[in-house]
Amino acid sequence: MGQKTNPNGLRLGIIRTWESQWCVNDKEIPNLIKEDFLIRKLINNFAKKSAISQIDIERLKEKNKNRITISVHTAKPGVIIGKDGDTRNKLVAKLKELTQKDVNLNVLEVKNSDKVALLIAQNMAEKLENRMFFRRVQKMAIQKAIKAGAKGVKTLISGRLGGAEIARSEGHAEGRVPLHTLRADIDYAAVEAHTTYGVLGIKVWIFHGEVLPGQTILDTRKLFASQSSNNPNRRPRNFKGGNNNHVNAKKN
């Protein structure tokens, strides 16, 4: 089951929490879900090159129903803040116009972007669109993540790889990625790369460690030194779709 499902959704309520947090009446739920979708779409379109990894939306206090707290996690906070906060103020104005509510915008810096699955996948997509060879793209991403301290990394690219007539899937993995272990902190992302040969699908799994009793997901994502990069006996694993000698990538 862990091989089929989205690792982020599978761990919600166990070791992960929701990115939208609010308590309202049943009649208000559809409108707020749509509003959250439009808020995230506006922020991502407004700051496309700011490497946004996560957007948290909170409406927790009943006394402040007309107030929304938005936390943007980004590897490039200066792009969103701008000179003297001008860019941030423009974004807040657009959000107020969209929601017709008071908006409190927090910009949080992602200290190590090489261990964030979404940022890694976006970086891989950008390189593929610039016609870099797909195997090199995967190996570079895995090496950076392991060097940054990830305990396990797995990548998968699907589509017309290298301009081939028949689409296939090919992936690489290094370290442990225990998808069936619910206490395992696994960061997952899936993005698309639009190339001249068509659309390529990119999936990335990052294993940060196990969340033990009394710990939170923040404990496993602290910066730690990579011990695996100094192990000469470790060999990366490769797998290709449609080849009986390897793991079937489509089932992963």
Curated annotation (Swiss-Prot):
Lineage: Bacteria, Bacillati, Mycoplasmatota, Mollicutes, Acholeplasmatales
Name of the protein this chain belongs to: Small ribosomal subunit protein uS3
One GO location term (cellular component): cytosolic small ribosomal subunit
GO biological process, one term: translation
Assembly behavior: Part of the 30S ribosomal subunit. Forms a tight complex with proteins S10 and S14.
Gene Ontology MF annotations: mRNA binding; rRNA binding; structural constituent of ribosome
Gene: rpsC
Cross-referenced PANTHER family: 30S/40S RIBOSOMAL PROTEIN S3, SMALL RIBOSOMAL SUBUNIT PROTEIN US3C
Ranges where the record places region Disordered: 226-252
Family: Belongs to the universal ribosomal protein uS3 family.
Keywords: Ribonucleoprotein, Ribosomal protein, RNA-binding, rRNA-binding
UniProt function note: Binds the lower part of the 30S subunit head. Binds mRNA in the 70S ribosome, positioning it for translation.
KH type-2 domain segment(s): 39-111
Record-linked NCBIfam families: rpsC_bact
